[in-house]
Amino acid sequence: MNNISIISIMLTLIVSLIVPPAFAAVYASRHKKQGIWSAWLVGALGFFVPQILIRLPILAALSRTDGFIAFSQTHTLIYGFALAFTAGLFELSGRYAAARCLKKNLTYRRALAAGLGHGGIEAIIITGLAYLSNVVFLVMLQTGGFEATVAQTTAAGGDVTALLTAKDALMNTPWALFLLAGFERLLAMTCHAAMSMLVCYGVHTNRVLPWTLACLAMHTCMDFIASISLFVGKGLSQTMAYTIIYVLLTAVTVFAIVILKTIRARWAAEEAQEVPYDSQA
C-alpha cells in the first residue's frame, strides 16, 4: 500500500474518531457550566438508540430474506428512497426525544451540542471504528502479523477467506475513496448539527410539526443522495456517481450552515427580548 493511501486512512480516522469528542471538549471549555457535555450525550443517544439498537438490526434481519434481497436489486430507486426515509424517520424520533429531554434548559448552544453529539457518535461508530480496524490491519500487514494469523487459522482448520478478502479490499481501494470517507463525515456532521437544530428550535418555539418535517425532508434528501452509489454498474460509473454525490452533499451542507446561522440569529433575537425575572419589581 502506498503512502498516500496510508495518510488518507489516518486523516479519515482522525476526522471520524478523534475530531467529534475533541471538538465537543473545546466547545464545552469555551462555554463552561452551560450543560454542553450533557446535551452532547443526549444528542448521541438520539442517534444510538433508534439507529444502532433498532433500525440497523431490523435491516440486518431483512437483508437475510430472499424477498428483501430481490426487491433491493430490482427496485433500486424505491429501495434507496426507503433506506433514506426510514433513516430520517428513526433518527428524527431520536432528535425529538433529545430535544424534549433538554426542553427545560434548551439554549442555542445546547441545541448545537446535541446536534454535534448526534453526528459525532455516528461518525465514531459508522466510520471511526471501521478505520481503526483498517489501521490495525495495516499494522498487521507491515509487521507480519497478518501472515501469522492466516497461518494459525489455516493450521487450526479455519476458513481464511474473510481475512484474504479484507486484505484485498484494503489494498485495492483507491486512496481517494479513503479520503472521501473523511470528507463525507465532515459534511454529515455539519448537516446533523443543522437537522437537530431544526427539531430543537421547533420544540423551543412550540412549533414542532413544521420544523420536524423540515428535518425529515432534509435528512431524506441527504441520504437519498448517498444512495446514488447503488446505481454504480447500472449505467453509472463509479467516478460519475461519486462526483454527483459529493457535489450535491456539499450543496446540502452549505444549506445546513445557512440554517445554523439563521436559527442562531432568530434565537438570539428572541433571548434579547426576554425580560429577566430579577429585573421585575
Outline where the language-model segments fall.
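Hydrophobic alpha-helical segments at protein termini of multi-pass membrane proteins
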Residues: 1-281
